[in-house]
Amino acid sequence: MKKLSQNLNSDFISAANRLAGRNARRKVVAYVESYDDVFFWSNLLRRLETPDCYFEVMLPSRDSLCKGKKIALSNRLGARLGDSMIACVDADYDYLMQGATETSRTVCTSPYVFHTYVYAIENYQCYAPALHNVCVMATLNDHRLFDFEAFLGDYSETIWPLLVWSVWAYRYGRYPSFSLLDFYRVVQIERLNYYHPEQTIEQLRRRVNAKVSRLQRLFPQGRQTYKPLREELLALGLTPRTAYLYMRGHDLFDGVVGPMLGGVCEALRRERERDIRRLAGHEVQLQNELSAYRHAVAPVEEMLRKHTGYENSEPYRRVQDDIRRFLERGKATPPPAAARPAPPAAED
């Protein structure tokens, strides 16, 4: 006999909602890709709950550690989605592919699948306007040592032509010749001059231009399709100044923003400790204050994963709008009619 969980679908949840009574709040189960995603989606969905509806965020499998978009959108689960059961996933390149693959078609067209628009949750965590506050959270020092927004804007403008080529390679099946890893090897920041970031950008620009030239020679057919794709990406909401939000998330987190914040936070901590040493009246006070400060600060990577400063970003608001429309559709859809009893048998 099949497990109950295998028969669990949107209709089952809807029936359970009806059993709870007419005045009870409707529950919507939201499946996410992995436990790492639970906080992000729970925080987003919780703020959109209404007096009539609430969400419960779950993993797609309770009896295994399998995770990822393929599990969250598997045929077994996909057919079970509906007004009371949804899937919440990273967009990856599927949003930009606009239906070129089966997964992309599901992500872009299913009314019960919601995606991040940006590549992944890590991209939201690296949202440039929020990074200064992340440094404050990690170091308890509000001194602005580095302009994160300006740097990531310049970084994005520099990698933008190559990002379009990366999407092109996946859209037209040429990714074995130009994979996401190949893209990352060009755009990673190995060393950042915090005092002259323009030097780092110029080195990056030379690498990007060289790679673009090689791709143009390798794929001459791209002359007819590259520019239309670029215009399509712009219409989808990408801009040259925000291209970093659409590159692979863990590459951005681990290879660009994480190390960049690490260096800034280390300088901020040293600065705060110098202030403590300068202001301490005696050795005991110095040691007490240093100990208290070091106990109060936090690892920057932990703060980068926990902050919610991206909630004012345009892509995040688009996700919220999608959820609001889903809730409005649910209110407008009448519940299935209750089963009627069979008519009495006719008397002879």
Residue ranges and their predicted role:
Residues 1-348:
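Acidic, divalent-metal-binding catalytic cores of TOPRIM
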